[in-house]
Amino acid sequence: LMQGTAIVISPLISLMKDQVDAAVENGIAAVFMNSSLDQREISDVYRRLKERQVKLLYIAPERFAMPQFTEMLKGIPLSLFAIDEAHCISEWGHDFRPDYLALSAIPALFPNVPIAAFTATATNASSPMHFLAMPLTLLMTIRPAPAPMK
């Protein structure tokens, strides 16, 4: 992994937990910060971040929209912003999860931190680049190969 903490923005608490568990199992210092944590646990995550003990931090877009959180991030070295399930930006952003649209502030707030977006289900119309209007360092859409013709 690169120097600093990578921020992974993920839509679901269960997905965060599964990915953090897998990372920790593989020796990577990963944590999540979401609404399932109490204030003591959140304070512990903040402490670990400030002490540079975290390589991967999983958050929901709602966490990124909190000014206190983004101010804290400015005080630690960041290696990457990774937007997981990036198709949610267009599918959920306008109605169900409006804080996905706040992610478009990443380049202005953190101009020297690379941004990557990952999805397996985006269509051309739901491309994260279209809705974020931000330069992505990497946009990865994985689609199944077409079935062979018989």
Where would I find each of the regions flagged by the language model?
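Conserved catalytic network of the ASCE P-loop NTPase/AAA+ motor domain
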Residues: 1-2, 23-25, 47-52, 71-76, ...
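Conserved Walker A/P-loop ATP-binding site and its immediately adjacent core
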Residues: 4-28, 32-37, 41, 60-63, ...
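Loop/turn-to-beta-strand initiation segments
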Residues: 4-7, 29, 53-57, 77-80, ...
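Conserved helix/coil segment N-terminal to the catalytic DExD/H
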Residues: 37-80, 88-94
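Post-DEXD/H (motif II) to motif III coupling segment of the RecA-like Helicase ATP-binding lobe
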Residues: 74-75, 79-136
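Short linear motifs in low-complexity or flexible loops
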Residues: 135-139, 144-148
